[in-house]
Amino acid sequence: MAEITSAKAMARTVRVSPRKTRLVLDLIRGKNVADAIAILKFTPNKAARVIEKTLNSAIANAENNFGLEKANLVVSETFANEGPTMKRFRPRAKGSASPINKRTTHVTVVVSEK
């Protein structure tokens, strides 16, 4: 049986737009996990907090479930898929209303050994 060299973590239905989340994910894809955490710490973005927690979860999964070394881990895959959209309405002039879409995101982070 082949040895497992990667671990995954997901954050589902996060109240951040997928488009804004992808901008942050592009910064850490392919980086060493220590560098990725440092980048996320200094990124002034709501999505960065969520991605940092998900990345730490993936690292913990790799260490505890598969016995991988944190020093050897790289962020191999990251993606943000669209979750369910909460539809709201904003009252406007003359009794009309405009739709407001509050988007959510499913964030996935995969770490693997170099």
UniProtKB/Swiss-Prot annotation:
Gene name of the encoded protein: rplV
Organism of provenance: Streptococcus agalactiae serotype V (strain ATCC BAA-611 / 2603 V/R)
Database matches in HAMAP family: Ribosomal_uL22_B
Family: Belongs to the universal ribosomal protein uL22 family.
PANTHER family registered for this protein in UniProt: CHLOROPLAST 50S RIBOSOMAL PROTEIN L22-RELATED, LARGE RIBOSOMAL SUBUNIT PROTEIN UL22M
PROSITE patterns in alphabetical order: RIBOSOMAL_L22
Residues in the signal sequence: none
CDD domains per UniProt: Ribosomal_L22
InterPro entries in alphabetical order: Ribosomal_uL22, Ribosomal_uL22_bac/chlpt-type, Ribosomal_uL22_bac/org-type, Ribosomal_uL22_CS, Ribosomal_uL22_sf
Summary of the function given for this chain in its UniProt record: This protein binds specifically to 23S rRNA; its binding is stimulated by other ribosomal proteins, e.g. L4, L17, and L20. It is important during the early stages of 50S assembly. It makes multiple contacts with different domains of the 23S rRNA in the assembled 50S subunit and ribosome. The globular domain of the protein is located near the polypeptide exit tunnel on the outside of the subunit, while an extended beta-hairpin is found that lines the wall of the exit tunnel in the center of the 70S ribosome.
Keywords: Ribonucleoprotein, Ribosomal protein, RNA-binding, rRNA-binding
Stated name of the protein: Large ribosomal subunit protein uL22
GO molecular function, one term: structural constituent of ribosome
Any GO BP: translation
Oligomer status and interactors: Part of the 50S ribosomal subunit.
